[in-house]
Amino acid sequence: MIDQNTGPLSAEEAAKEVILAREHAEAITIVLVTIGPSKALGQRIAVKRSQDGTLNILGAFEDKKLNNRAISLAKSSLDSRRSEDLHKSEVTTVSGQTYTLFVETYVPEPELIIVGAGHIAQPLCSTGIMLGFKVTVIDDRKKFVTQARFPDAHRLIEVDFNDPFKDVKISLNSYFVLVTRGHKYDFECLRILLKNDVEAGYIGMIGSRRRIRATFIQLVNDQIDPKRISQIKAPLGLDLGAETPAEIAIAIAAELVLLSRKGDGIPLSQKENIFKRFFDDT
């Protein structure tokens, strides 16, 4: 974390930081004092998260408790990954002053990188677009990465699986789904992702239990950090009993929503249990 403690930001400085963050596909939260002592009204700080996950604190409030609370709120808002997350929070400082903070977050559009342009990739691409992802589809077969097969994709890239991500940015804002036509391609792509200095926001791989176990053994033998290996979602997706490509795509998309929105995956009917609460007298 980088702390640039230079006093509060002006409105112009905060606006410039938002513009810069958007230009570099970085997430940023602005925290503004809307109610409090007159000298503090309109003061701002910003907390920016770079693509490698580094936090940069820009500006500072004079009151230490207020400043710490503002930074904490900004971090929580950034962790939510929700663009234009708006909320207010009250803070009472040691001196007894009460402040109201307005928190506004901007996050870049998440990118879904589908590795492998087969049958699952087509419905997953369409679903990803509907969920607000910029979708990139990559494959080493030119006839598969076509506009006709993926009319809604933002990018279609023919690659060499020995260096599949040379034109793809790996960041916390990147969601990688490995659904290639063969284990060796999935493994090579996975190995490259895990050896990258910057962690992806999500890495999921399709496959049977046997195939995934073999993949993990290979990664351990390649001396990949076990912590990085543990972050792989494999088999990817939620257990919906999916069988068709479209159903599997929905199961994968559901996991992406679950993780990005920090859900629990429990059916709402089970959580609310309306019948038992209101109609079951036993």
Q: What function would you assign to each model-found segment?
A:
Residues 143-147, 211-214:
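Short, charged/polar "capping" segments at the starts of alpha-helices
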Residues 1-140, 147-153, 157, 171-174, ...:
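Segments forming oxygen-rich coordination pockets for charged ligands
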